[in-house]
Design a protein with these regions (language model features):
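Short Gly/Thr-rich strand-loop-strand
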Residues: 102, 113, 169-176
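Buried hydrophobic positions in well-ordered alpha/beta secondary-structure cores of metabolic enzymes
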Residues: 47, 125-127, 156, 186, ...
Length: 263
C-alpha cells in the first residue's frame, strides 16, 4: 500500500482510482444505461469502506468521485448524463465535489463564494472556492451558487481545463495531502446551458434530491476506519492484552456495535 506516501508526501492515488473504476468501484451510483451497475448507495458505501480499511484519504477521493457522478445522475440533463457518466463510472474521467460552500451557505454557516450571471447560452461565474478535492487539469467537478438578480441557486459542471478557470495549490494539510484538495479560481468562466444540472427554477427540488445521499454515502469512510481501528486493537492485544483488558471499550464490543450499525 502507498498509505505513507499518500499521507506524508502528498502522493495522489490516481492510478489506483482509475483501476478501481475499471473494477466497478464507482458504478453503483450510475444507472446501467450510462455504464453503471445501478446498485445504489449501499454498494457505494461498501466499496468506500473497503478502501477506507487501508487508506482514509483514498476512501475520501472515492466519495468525491461517486458524489460527482451521483449529482449528474440525479439531474434532468440527459445530454450531460450521456457525456460524462460512462467515463465517471469506469474511472476514465475523475471528478470532485465542490458543493461544501453551497451547502454551508444554504444553512448560513458561510457566505456564498461564487456568483453567477445569466448570459446568452449559459452563465458567467466569478469567485474562488478555497477547498475542492479530487481535482486535476483533466478532472471535472460539480458546484453551485446563486444567480445575480435572482437569488436562487444554479448547479453546474466545471471542467478544470476550461478558459478563465485556474487550480491553485496553496495549502498544506495534516491528513489531506494526497487528496488533491485545491483552490478554484473563476474569472468570467463561461458555463454553457449544456453543463447546467439545475437552473434556478429547478434548484430547490434538485438540492432535495442530492443532499441526503451525499451525506449518507460518507458513512463508508467511517466504517472503513472503524474496521481498521478494530484490527489494530486486535493486533495490539496479542502482546498487550494484559494491559488493554482494562480499557472501557474492547474490540469485541466495538465489533458488535459496528455490526449493528451496518445492519
Amino acid at each position: 500500500p502507498r498509505v505513507t506516501a499518500i499521507d506524508l508526501e502528498g502522493e495522489y492515488p490516481e492510478a489506483f482510482l482509475r483501476a478501481a473504476g475499471q473494477l466497478g468501484a464507482f458504478a453503483g451510483v450510475v444507472a446501467p444505461e450510462f455504464g453503471g451497475s445501478g446498485k445504489g448507495i449501499a454498494d457505494t458505501i461498501a466499496q468506500m469502506a473497503k478502501i477506507g480499511e487501508t487508506c482514509l484519504s483514498t476512501a475520501f477521493t472515492h466519495w468525491c468521485q461517486t458524489a460527482c457522478a451521483r449529482y449528474i445522475q440525479l439531474s434532468d440533463n440527459a445530454a450531460a448524463k450521456a457525456e460524462f457518466l460512462p467515463a465517471l463510472a469506469s474511472g476514465r474521467q475523475l471528478g470532485g465535489t465542490g458543493l461544501s460552500n453551497t451547502f454551508k451557505s444554504c444553512c448560513e454557516i458561510e457566505r456564498f463564494l461564487l456568483t453567477a450571471k445569466r448570459v446568452e447560452g449559459g452563465y458567467e461565474i466569478n469567485g474562488t472556492l478555497p477547498w475542492v478535492s479530487n481535482l486535476g487539469d483533466d478532472h471535472i467537478f460539480v458546484t453551485g451558487c446563486p444567480v445575480d438578480g435572482d437569488g436562487r441557486l444554479l448547479f453546474f459542471i466545471v471542467q478544470c481545463k476550461q478558459p478563465g478557470f485556474k487550480l491553485v495549490d496553496g495549502a498544506h494539510f495534516t491528513a489531506l495531502e494526497g487528496t488533491r484538495t485545491l483552490a478554484c479560481q473563476f474569472r468570467n468562466v463561461r458555463i454553457a446551458d449544456s453543463r447546467v444540472l439545475a437552473h434556478p427554477e429547478q434548484s430547490t427540488e434538485y438540492l432535495q434530491r442530492i443532499q441526503p445521499g451525499m451525506i449518507l454515502a460518507q458513512l463508508g469512510m467511517g466504517i472503513g476506519l472503524i474496521r481498521d481501528c478494530i484490527r489494530l486493537i486486535d493486533s495490539a492485544g496479542r502482546t498487550h492484552q494484559h494491559i488493554n483488558c482494562y480499557e472501557d471499550d474492547q474490540a469485541d464490543d466495538l465489533r458488535a456495535a459496528l455490526a449493528a450499525a451496518e445492519a
